[in-house]
Amino acid sequence: MIRSLLIIMAIAFFPVASSAQGITPKAATPEMEFIMQLNVTLGEAYTVGETQAGRRHVIPITGGVFEGPRLHGTIINGGADYQLTSVDGKRTTLEAIYSIKTHDGINIHVRNEGIVYSGRDSDGKETFYFKAAPRFEAPADSKYAWLNNAIYVCSPSFGQPGTITLDVWMVR
């Protein structure tokens, strides 16, 4: 009886496994367009403490500049990066909320959510992953309203102490 059940399960699973290996995407691979580089200055981080969800940290965003092919300006003091680190310390989710001001005086709200992971991957290799997905809220009647209608991804990098650089791309 058990042997028959195992054979039936193997036969039922085989078509799924073989078809999954040969999947061909039907849609075109998304293209990326570089939008801007943000050079963010950070204040002194502080810890809220252990919560039910993990260890909460806050990093004030104190300013900076941004530049790209279609816009440039400053990062407004007053935002923060709210981070939540897992109990094992390997995974941190982040939510940075701040505003930028374009060179011509338009304020744009930014909410950037991401993941930082440091640990072993499925092959057992040490890995470090840090990516985020910013969303922009520009005034609907501004020349920057195009920012409201797309998906963005960013790759962070570290420079001088107290700074972080974010390269932002639009997914086309």
Residue ranges and their predicted role:
Residues M1-I2:
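N-terminal secretory signal peptides that target proteins for export/translocation
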Residues L5-P15:
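Bacterial N-terminal signal peptides
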Residues V16-A20:
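Sec/Tat signal peptide C-region and signal peptidase I cleavage site
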Residues Q21-R172:
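Beta-strand-enriched cores of mature, soluble protein domains
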